[in-house]
């Protein structure tokens, strides 16, 4: 079954309002084994909406439309669908009843302008809106079934779940396909390299698809399939997951789609370990990432942004002589920072960073992009020194934070 999504409204078209509805609908359809081919958006124009509906119905089995069902003059979707289907608008008893019930339950008066929402294309099947005034509807146009829903996200989600998807599942009948997918997360490789290593995917795994998404500095690889039975779909997704791990290598750190901070948290919980962080160049970003994970209070104990040298001395016990001799950005300094924060917090691990995020502050010996990472644990302190610059302060800070988290992750393996 092929589906398309049509969003209507000037505010959506102009970007004033983000179309979160399309993303939600696509995810629900994907889980039901339905292939979403296109997302389309048109403004509040009767002719444009009608033309889009006609065009989409010629190539899709199912069309899901959002927006334009309200009582105002710019709510044109119902009339546009009627025009595309060459149907007249008629008062639908079910739509009228659901609207009257809605107003009575809320002790409100139904205005004349509201009655417009009970006018549906002739032959349409009303889909009751349990939490709003505007009913939705389903209308067959040739081989395509059109489902029209409100644009208000919570109303759309409710209608999609209770009124639209059950009808679509009935339309699928015995021809339903079952979807399965897995998401793998990668750190430490550029997108181009990941793409090269995925080159043989289609030949090795017929019937599987993959997509690559970047959220710097992580890369997410989603493998997916649709099959006549759920067991086959799940088995193929598992095989694809193993293929990706083999081809991409140890840079794949999660096959559950976890971000690096979440994977580190999972490993800390598994090891019954705790962590404390001392940050200089990352400015609290590591702590923010770790505490953004639900349940992080089980393993995250303390964070100190010891940006100034004196703070490193006063809070963490770093020797002034170490800083004077080697500099704040040095493996010697982060060694003492990591050891100090571990001691102060009483944590299993102490993680520390010091570096030069830029755009200024670099030298020939320590250019912008230089970061030193220290990790103190029960078996001592390890340090590392890396120089990787994106000539962008925010990107450098984020990369530094992920390099530190990756150091901890590998220690926990």
From Swiss-Prot:
Cited SUPFAM superfamilies: CinA-like, Molybdenum cofactor biosynthesis proteins
Pfam families named in the record: CinA, CinA_KH, MoCF_biosynth
Coiled-coil parts of chain: none
InterPro entries in the cross-refs: CinA, CinA-like_C, CinA_C, CinA_KH, Competence-induced_CinA, MoaB/Mog-like_dom_sf, MoaB/Mog_dom
UniProt xrefs under HAMAP family: CinA_B
PANTHER family: NICOTINAMIDE-NUCLEOTIDE AMIDOHYDROLASE PNCC (PTHR13939), NMN AMIDOHYDROLASE-LIKE PROTEIN YFAY (PTHR13939:SF0)
Family per similarity comment: Belongs to the CinA family.
Protein name (Swiss-Prot/TrEMBL): CinA-like protein
Species annotation: Desulfosudis oleivorans (strain DSM 6200 / JCM 39069 / Hxd3)
């Amino acid at each position: 079954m092929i589906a398309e999504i049509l969003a209507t409204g000037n505010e959506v078209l102009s970007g004033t309002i983000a179309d979160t509805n399309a993303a939600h609908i696509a995810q629900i359809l994907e889980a039901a084994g339905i292939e979403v081919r296109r997302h389309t958006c048109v403004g509040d124009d009767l002719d444009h909406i009608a033309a889009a509906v006609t065009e989409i119905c010629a190539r899709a089995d199912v069309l899901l439309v959002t927006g334009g069902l309200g009582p105002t003059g710019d709510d044109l979707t119902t009339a546009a669908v009627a025009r595309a289907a060459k149907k007249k608008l008629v008062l639908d008893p079910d739509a009228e009843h659901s609207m009257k019930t809605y107003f009575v339950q809320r002790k409100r008066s139904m205005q004349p302008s509201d009655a417009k929402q009970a006018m549906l294309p002739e032959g349409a099947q009303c889909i009751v809106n349990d939490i709003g005034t505007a009913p939705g509807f389903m209308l067959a146009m040739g081989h395509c079934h059109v489902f029209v829903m409100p644009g208000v996200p919570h109303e759309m989600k409710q209608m999609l779940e209770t009124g639209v998807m059950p009808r679509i599942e009935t339309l699928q009948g015995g021809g339903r396909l079952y979807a399965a997918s897995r998401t793998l997360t990668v750190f430490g490789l550029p997108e181009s390299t990941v793409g090269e290593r995925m080159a043989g995917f289609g030949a090795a795994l017929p019937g599987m698809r993959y997509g690559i998404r970047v959220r710097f500095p992580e890369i997410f690889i989603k493998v997916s399939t649709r099959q006549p039975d759920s067991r086959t779909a799940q088995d193929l997704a598992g095989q694809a997951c193993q293929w990706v791990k083999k081809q991409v290598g140890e840079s794949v750190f999660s096959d559950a789609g976890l971000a690096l901070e979440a994977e580190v948290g999972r490993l800390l919980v598994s090891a019954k370990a705790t962590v404390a962080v001392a940050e200089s160049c990352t400015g609290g970003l590591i702590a923010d990432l770790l505490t953004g994970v639900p349940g992080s209070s089980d393993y995250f104990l303390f964070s100190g942004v010891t940006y100034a040298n004196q703070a490193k001395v006063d809070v963490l016990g770093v020797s002034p002589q170490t800083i004077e001799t080697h500099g704040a950005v040095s493996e010697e300094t982060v060694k003492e920072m990591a050891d100090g924060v571990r001691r102060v917090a009483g944590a299993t691990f102490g993680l520390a960073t010091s570096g030069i995020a830029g755009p200024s502050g670099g030298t020939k010996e320590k250019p912008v992009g230089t970061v030193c990472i220290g990790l103190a644990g029960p078996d001592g302190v390890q340090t590392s020194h890396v120089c990787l610059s994106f000539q962008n302060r925010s990107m450098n800070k984020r990369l530094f934070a992920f390099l530190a988290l990756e150091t901890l992750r590998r220690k926990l393996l």
